């Protein structure tokens, strides 16, 4: 079966690169382009006063200074709000997001983004991957870019929409995200960070000794090869 791909252009949503749509729909899905937080004049947004939608509620600052925290809060809010606008234009909302990728310039400030995400997506956020990158915008001022896959509510051919798969056997994560969701006959899983959930504090898996014996098939002994390949193979 051949599906038609339809581009979506959102009013009052600046194009990061001229001519590229904010999303495309096909086969019941909505594929959302990377949302770089921009002002209406096309420049990178850096503070709440530049938002055209309702800004995030004011909260006491964390250990970060306002200079560092304000761009992160505002840009995160902008990204989620624009994704929400795309889905609302199709009769849906953020609960229809099945998978997202969060590209971050400074992962050490992730907690600031997480506070915004909690407000926007509630207790059942979609499976996601947090990815550290060198840059997320041409001018270097954007801290975050978010893209995703969602249901296209206007053309979803199945009765069931997104449902969180609750399985206590699924490995824990380092942050609060759904491990997997189902939608119709499809399953979407989150990115998995290699952590040792059996150890206190759930530390990162770093070497062969952190995994069961059957996972040490590339190990040859205490050698330079092991010190180089160990973390990669174990993770």
Residue ranges and their predicted role:
Residues 1-81, 85-234:
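N-terminal presequence-like segments and the immediate start of the first folded domain
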């Amino acid at each position: 079966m051949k599906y038609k791909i339809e581009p979506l252009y959102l009013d009052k949503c600046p194009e990061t690169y001229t001519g590229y749509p904010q999303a495309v729909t096909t086969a019941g899905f909505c594929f959302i382009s990377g949302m770089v937080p921009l002002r209406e004049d096309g420049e990178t947004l850096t503070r709440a006063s530049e938002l055209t939608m309702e800004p995030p509620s004011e909260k006491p600052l964390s250990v970060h200074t306002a200079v560092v925290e304000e761009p992160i809060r505002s840009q995160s809010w902008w990204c989620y709000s624009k994704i929400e606008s795309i889905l609302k234009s199709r009769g849906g909302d953020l609960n229809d997001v099945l998978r997202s990728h969060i590209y971050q310039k400074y992962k050490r400030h992730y907690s600031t983004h997480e506070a915004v995400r909690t407000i926007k997506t509630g207790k059942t956020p979609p499976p996601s991957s947090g990815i550290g990158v060198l840059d997320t915008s041409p001018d270097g001022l954007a801290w975050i870019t978010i893209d995703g896959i969602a249901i296209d509510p206007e053309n979803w051919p199945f009765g069931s929409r997104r449902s969180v798969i609750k399985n206590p056997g699924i490995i824990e994560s380092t942050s609060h995200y759904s491990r997997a969701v189902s939608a119709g006959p499809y399953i979407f899983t989150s990115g998995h960070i290699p952590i040792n959930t059996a150890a206190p504090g759930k530390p990162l898996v770093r070497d062969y000794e952190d995994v069961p014996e059957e996972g040490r098939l590339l190990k040859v002994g205490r050698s330079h090869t092991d010190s180089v390949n160990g973390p990669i193979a174990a993770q």
